[in-house]
Amino acid sequence: MFLFLSALFYLALFFVHTHFLLTYSPLVFLGLVYLLPVLFNAGVLGLQRSKNWSFLSFVQLPTFASMSYVAFAYQADATGLWEQFISLYSITDGDMTVEIAPSLLDMGQLVFMMLVYYGGALAQYGWETYKERSKKKEVTYA
């Protein structure tokens, strides 16, 4: 059930990104594209957690997030939305220059996205297993 709802969330997120990209500021873009999926995954994994959760649960959600990101990046590149976003927010002012990556599908962007999504899930998995081990150590037998 959680996986189905998560897939719907990422599908909706894809459509929101493709329709509202040009209304995002760069800070909002970073929050919605990189931070929101990590927080969403953490929330779902926290709700889903039961006695039989496994490492697989911590891989599936970042995979959905990654697929949504790649689909959005492809759509933004193919339609020219990303070029419009770049032209809106690339700034050159004297000594300072703010540049945005020419494509969301650049290798550096994809590696960063994977590190953020899977790194967040791996950190949560480590934290959850640490808590489980701590609970087992606290059990006293009479």
PLM features per residue range, with description:
Residues 12-17, 40, 44, 48, ...:
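Alpha-helical membrane-inserting segments
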Residues 19-29, 68-109:
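Interfacial non-cytosolic loop connecting adjacent transmembrane helices
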Residues 1-38:
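N-terminal signal-anchor transmembrane alpha-helix
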Residues 1-9, 55-74:
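Transmembrane alpha-helical segments of multi-pass membrane proteins
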Residues 6, 86-134:
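Alpha-helical membrane-associated segments of multi-pass integral membrane proteins
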